[in-house]
């Protein structure tokens, strides 16, 4: 009976990690054909924001320059001029098709993320008792660690997320969030976020250290300071 009670929260933890993802993945496959049909039949024109329009124009200019260079290398005749125009037309259609697919992927990503968040929220609300048990297990595990181990864990987390080498990691996380949400990444916005977010989190982390850790466990704070020095 005790083993069964211990196994139930672990099964809940595994299900809360994989079940929402599996359901959202299945729904995504089901929505894909419907969104594709709706987008291709219901949209009379492609709507682009400034970032998407700029990106598409840059790709078109690069394509035009490459094709023009290719034709300059060949013999300059009317036949090649016609082939040049046909090549531009085909590649333009391909670029627009890719942009159209990206727009459909954006809608699918956004819809899937809403479904995933709804399932995860509902699952968490219905399983409050199991979450309480998992929380007590985590607290007991941390409580049983030595002060040195706790200080090393704090140092590892702080260096991983807030160290001098963390900006590439933050850039990867921000780009991943952009891709998951289905929003076109803006390089200037990403640069600003990479500069600001680590500073904000570092300030909050240091405030937590000196505001709470000083009263809870001064020895851990002393070990952390000695290790960092």
Swiss-Prot record:
GO terms for cellular component: chloroplast inner membrane. Its main location: plastid. The chain crosses the membrane at residues 7-27, 107-127. It comes from the Eukaryota. GO terms for molecular function: antiporter activity; proton transmembrane transporter activity. Contributes to K(+)/H(+) antiport activity by supporting proton efflux to control proton extrusion and homeostasis in chloroplasts in a light-dependent manner to modulate photosynthesis. Prevents excessive induction of non-photochemical quenching (NPQ) under continuous-light conditions. Indirectly promotes efficient inorganic carbon uptake into chloroplasts. This is Potassium/proton antiporter CemA. It comes from Solanum lycopersicum (Tomato).
């Amino acid at each position: 009976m005790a083993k069964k009670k211990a196994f139930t929260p672990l099964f809940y933890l595994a299900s809360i990690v994989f079940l929402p993802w599996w359901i959202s993945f299945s729904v995504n496959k089901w929505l894909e054909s419907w969104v594709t049909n709706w987008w291709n039949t219901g949209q009379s024109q492609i709507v682009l924001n400034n970032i998407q329009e700029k990106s598409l124009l840059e790709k078109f200019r690069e394509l035009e320059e490459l094709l023009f260079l290719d034709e300059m290398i060949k013999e300059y005749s009317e036949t090649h001029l016609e082939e040049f125009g046909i090549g531009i037309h085909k590649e333009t259609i391909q670029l627009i098709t890719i942009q159209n697919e990206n727009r459909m992927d954006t809608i699918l990503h956004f819809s899937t993320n809403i479904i995933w968040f709804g399932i995860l929220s509902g699952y968490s609300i219905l399983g409050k008792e199991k979450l309480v048990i998992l929380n007590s297990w985590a607290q007991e595990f941390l409580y049983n660690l030595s002060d040195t181990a706790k200080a090393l864990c704090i140092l590892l987390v702080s260096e991983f997320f807030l160290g001098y080498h963390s900006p590439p990691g933050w850039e990867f996380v921000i780009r991943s969030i952009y891709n998951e949400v289905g929003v076109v990444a803006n390089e200037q916005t990403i640069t600003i976020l990479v500069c600001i977010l680590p500073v904000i989190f570092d300030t909050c982390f240091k405030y937590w250290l000196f505001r709470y850790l000083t009263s809870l466990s001064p020895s851990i704070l002393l070990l952390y300071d000695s290790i960092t020095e």
